[in-house]
UniProtKB/Swiss-Prot annotation:
This is Lipoate-protein ligase A. NCBIfam families: lipoyltrans. Residues 29-216 form the BPL/LPL catalytic domain. It comes from Escherichia coli O139:H28 (strain E24377A / ETEC). Its main location: cytoplasm. Its EC number is 6.3.1.20. The gene is lplA. It is found in: Cytoplasm. It comes from the Bacteria. (R)-lipoate binds at K134. Catalyzes both the ATP-dependent activation of exogenously supplied lipoate to lipoyl-AMP and the transfer of the activated lipoyl onto the lipoyl domains of lipoate-dependent enzymes. InterPro entries: aa-tRNA-synth_II/BPL/LPL (IPR045864), BPL_LPL_catalytic (IPR004143), Lipoate_ligase_A (IPR023741), Lipoate_protein_ligase_C (IPR019491), LipoylTrfase_LipoateP_Ligase (IPR004562).
Amino acid sequence: MSTLRLLISDSYDPWFNLAVEECIFRQMPATQRVLFLWRNADTVVIGRAQNPWKECNTRRMEEDNVRLARRSSGGGAVFHDLGNTCFTFMAGKPEYDKTISTSIVLNALNALGVSAEASGRNDLVVKTAEGDRKVSGSAYRETKDRGFHHGTLLLNADLSRLANYLNPDKKKLAAKGITSVRSRVTNLTELLPGITHEQVCEAITKAFFAHYGERVEAEIISPDKTPDLPNFAETFARQSSWEWNFGQAPAFSHLLDERFSWGGVELHFDVEKGHITRAQVFTDSLNPAPLEALAGRLQGGLYRADMLQQECEALLVDFPDQEKELRELSTWIAGAVR
């Protein structure tokens, strides 16, 4: 019986694909070597310890229907679209070795006619007249008895959108998390016009089989039927939840300020695990009572636009004469924290 396993996802849902990856990783026998090939529609994928409000333009993501997905490995934020091919190599220890999986990807690229090399921060680069250009980035995760290496290859990604979503608004964030290093990148289509996701997957698969001297039939993973993976439903629910994707952010502080016709407002938030641990309001409004009440209501609540808006509007009952001010405040806060 082969020790290899090859899985190919036909889903573009990042939460589905990351849930599949997590389930396979947790449940695979320690003797198995796994290759999982997949890709995501418009998504910003952040590292396990990153702060989405720091890393991403979350407001523009919401406007453009771009998803946020937190992965279980470390590293920085990346934008995925269908111009990316994603790969995951898994193996038990002591056989797990990220240099092996890196070599397999380099061999696949070489077979396609691209000479690339490993570089620095877990990247694969190609030499161009303008200097080294990144075509692949990776991240890793290890437990006591197993490990995985996953990454992306840029085939025909929309690089302008990458800059849109990974450049955050100039907000006054004092984050305790990590801001990603931005890298100079290029698409493989610049080197191999017409290259497709299917061709890249085939090349990686062949290099995987060649390295281990075995072949195995591919398993197609699809959301049309629930994958036969123990605890998949629970894993998918967690992977797609606000609590995981946003709530796992490191502690940070956020200062919002705005001037309205009725006065200036400053809101200071301390946020931990997606919850507001402290809310302070400063204003030169002639009637500060609604804002003072708002600070008390926000304490302990979720740092989510809809929840903040809900708390603002709840004050209309106690302060009906300030309806105009509270509605303006509600709209501003909801937009500012997205």
